[in-house]
Structures are given as C-alpha cells and as structure tokens.
Amino acid sequence: MSAANPETPNSTISREASTQSSSAAASQGWVLPEGKIVPNTVFVGGIDARMDETEIGSCFGRYGSVKEVKIITNRTGVSKGYGFVSFVNDVDVQKIVGSQIHFHGKKLKLGPAIRKQKLCARHVQPRPLVVNPPPPPQFQNVWRNPNTETYLQPQITPNPVTQHVQSAANPETPNSTISREASTQSSSAAASQGWVLPEGKIVPNTVFVGGIDARMDETEIGSCFGRYGSVKEVKIITNRTGVSKGYGFVSFVNDVDVQKIVGSQIHFHGKKLKLGPAIRKQKLCARHVQPRPLVVNPPPPPQFQNVWRNPNTETYLQPQITPNPVTQHVQAYSAYPHSPGQVITGCQLLVYNYQEYPTYPDSAFQVTTGYQLPVYNYQPFPAYPRSPFQVTAGYQLPVYNYQAFPAYPNSPFQVATGYQFPVYNYQPFPAYPSSPFQVTAGYQLPVYNYQAFPAYPNSPFQVATGYQFPVYNYQAFPAYPNSPVQVTTGYQLPVYNYQAFPAYPSSPFQVTTGYQLPVYNYQAFPAYPNSAVQVTTGYQFHVYNYQMPPQCPVGEQRRNLWTEAYKWWYLVCLIQRRD
C-alpha cells in the first residue's frame, strides 16, 4: 500500500488535519467530510434569520479577534442557516467547537471549517462521464443576451466524483498551464471570503458582485466601484421580467487588482456586498471521455416550434444529449418560469404561448389563472374536440381576453372570479351542449349566457358558476323571485363587467369577488330587509340601492326630532328651577 501511495509532506499534513478534524468534532458526534481544515475558522450552523453578521461576530469575540463573519446565502440573499467565523490570530478551534453557545435562545451547531479536497484522476479508476445537457429549447430566452456567454456556460458534471480523468491523457500545454495558474489565482483571491470556487478560468478585470439589493441600480454600483478603476460595464443579472436576481458583474477598462477588490469590505445601502472573481466555467473536451453511444432528444413537438423562431438560437442551444434512454419529450413539473412556452396544468400538461404565474406584463396576452397555468388555443385537459376553441387545463384554467386574479384594469372585459377563472367562447369542463356559449374553467365554472350549474329554467339568463363565480341578471341561489334583478353567486363571487377583488373604485360597476364582498350600491353583510331591491352576494345577503349607515333626517323626520328635543330641553329647565 505504501508503495502505491508514497507519502508526501502534503499528504502528511492532510492526514494530521483530518485527525484534528475528527477529534475537534467528537463532542458534536459528527462524521466530518474528508478534507483540509481551514485554520482559525469555525463552521457555525443553526443560524436564525434574525441573526446578522455583526451579532455573531460579537458573540465569538470572547475567543479572539474576529476577522470576518460569513453567512452563506442563496442567490436572492436569503440566509441558508449556516456560515463561518474566521479569526485574525491563532485560536483553539477545538475548544470553541467543544463549547456550548446559545444565541437568541437557540443552540448553535459548531464545527471546524473543512475545505473539501478534490479527488485527482490518478486516485480513481477511469469511469464514464455523464454530461449535463445545455438547457432545453424552452429556456432559450435566458440566452437572449449575447454577453451572457461571458458568465454562463452549460453545466458539466462528471459522474460520480471526479471532474477530470487521467492527467496522462492530457499532456500539459501552455494554455493548460495558464488555465491552472488562473485557477490558483482564483483560489487565493477568494481565500478571505472562505469560498470554494468552481473550476474555470478567471475573466480578467471583472468582479462578481453578490447581495445586490433591489434598490441598487447599475449606475450606483458603477460609481461605488469607480474608486478601483475606470468601470467599463456593470451587468446586473435579471430574470425575463427585469427583476434583479441579486447578483451581477463589474468589468473595468484597464488592468485592476481583482484580488485586492475581492478582499475589501464594501457596504452599499447598509448592506455588505459579496465579492469574488468572475469565473468562466471550462468546457470538458471530448478527448477527456470514452466515446459512448448517446440518446439524442428529438426537437420539440409542433406546439413548441415558436422557441426556434430566433435564428440566433443555435449559437447557444444544442439538442439535448443525455446518456439515459428515459428522455422523450417530458415537460417537468413544476413550471419553469423563464421559459417562453411553459404552460403546465394539473399533471404535467404542456401547452403553448401563454402568460405564466406570476404574470409578466411584457406579454402581449395577459392570461394567467391561479396556480396551474392556462393559455390560448391549445388542447385542454381533458380535450373536447367538438369545441371550436380549446382553452382549458387542470384545475383553475381560463384564458383569452379576460380579467385575471388579481385584476388587470387594462382588460376590455372584466370577468374574473376568485380562484378559478373563466373566459370567453370555449368548451367548458364538463360541457353543457345546450348552451350557445361554452365558457367554463376549473371544476364546473361557467359564465355568460348558458345553462347554469344547477340550472334555473325560469331565469331569463342562465349565468352561474359552480361553487363560486356568478354574473349578471339571472335567477339567484337561492332565488328571490320578488327581486327585479337576480345577482347572487353560490357562496361568494359575482362577475360580468365588474371590478375584481380587491375593488377598484375607478370602475363604473362595483361588483366585487372575495368572501362576502359587495357589488353595486347595496348594503353588505348581514342582510337588510328594508332594501327596495334584493340583490344577493356572499352567503345570500341582500343588497342594492339601500340606506347606507344612518343618514341625517330630512322633512317630517327633522321636525319630529326638533319637537322631541324641545320637550327634553323644557323638562331640564323645570328641574333646574326646582333645584
């Protein structure tokens, strides 16, 4: 064994570090990962969302001078619940790990900070590699920015643990030497941050900036970094709606000391920025793997052909390649928000050209409903081939030219109700063939001018929808025959040319949907029987054209009040005279 693995100074140090790691965490009962202990640094777990870096640093100040507290966050800046505390001078990490620290009434989980070692190819048998494919065609919009390739590359992960195969198969070249030196510089540049950077080549004169707040814009960030050199460009990464993802890149015109910038502490708008070198991930060349037969996914089905309309797409997207036979057109569940053609409803039901949830105002059509997402002119779930328009899907699914939830006042038609959302001229679920218009969505939820559920044959208009969602001029549930107008909705929620929930006072019609929500000029819940007209909403609660909270009396009522007031005043005067 020793002949196969001759000891080197590095291996001896690593073994001693692993031994120290095991003993340091003995009190915690952990089995630590293989790797090298980061000196004078403590892993801290169980960090509550209320804790900030300043408080944690003051808590650990009893053990020595704290150099930095690093709370690990996700891309949006939300804490992942753990972090690292590094000290300026040498400290007894084993003693700190063995102590019991409670903070905000919560016990912190302590351990040594371990930098995992990468397993070199010569330590393992050569194994076939699984290459992650580039994003499928529906993700082409994330590549629309031609500058994106500077920062994003298809993810490549070897299976199971190694990222390179035998170094003998890859003789060193000047380029490989430069790349290795760049990686070394990357590791040292981020040492103060305690990061393990991805494999790749550093983009020169460019800094990664994380923890960007929504209030920060590119101009402010550029002026903040102007102290280090002439800023060429500030790029904040956003999603397709233009909302910041919380990170970006700052590039400089001239050569700058990226390592110095990364090591500095920059606070902006009261928030510490997370800095690091910009890494361009390396692509794994074909010569690094054994040739294997591949299963190539076919192009998207016809309804997805719109994603190929951009002639530049081939620059960034290639057919998906996965060495696994289980890859036929499968649309994942849940939806992918950054796809232009992601329409998933119910149980993995794909569609075409719709507005997702949440809605993106840059879409020509605003068609969104609830949780599962519906659209325009596609095969419903289940399909009704006899319908001229197929627009239904899953549980809550309506479409074309209607008012969503929440309401969008720019729609010419305001027809939306609560959770399930119906629309215009399509086959309902289930269908009512006796209706001239089939407009239903969800569980049996129809609207305009059709046979209601249940039907009221004595009503001039049949406009009711399942559990919630009614409209205009129909027989109520239960019916109030003495009312000239019947406007009620099952349990709650009326419709037709109305203002959605919450109400928008700018609407000429005030007909609200929600739980017990009023309609047009009426007395809300509970019912007021003295109303001239009974128009019910909510739990059958009368309304329409009634006396709002008591108003000032007029005419005879005013005279009677003055008479009563005079009587009381006269009695008071008599009592005062007797006294």
UniProtKB/Swiss-Prot annotation:
Residues 1-27, 163-192 are annotated as: Disordered. Residues 40-115, 205-280 form the RRM domain. Residues 332-355, 356-379, 380-403, 404-427, 428-451, 452-475, 476-499, 500-523, 524-547 form the DAZ domain. It is found in: Cytoplasm; Nucleus. Coiled coil: none annotated. Belongs to the RRM DAZ family. It is linked to Spermatogenic failure Y-linked 2: A disorder resulting in the absence (azoospermia) or reduction (oligozoospermia) of sperm in the semen, leading to male infertility. Forms a heterodimer with BOLL and DAZL. Interacts with PUM2, DAZAP1, DAZAP2, DZIP1 and DZIP3. This is Deleted in azoospermia protein 4. The lineage of its organism: Eukaryota, Metazoa, Chordata, Craniata, Vertebrata. The gene is DAZ4.
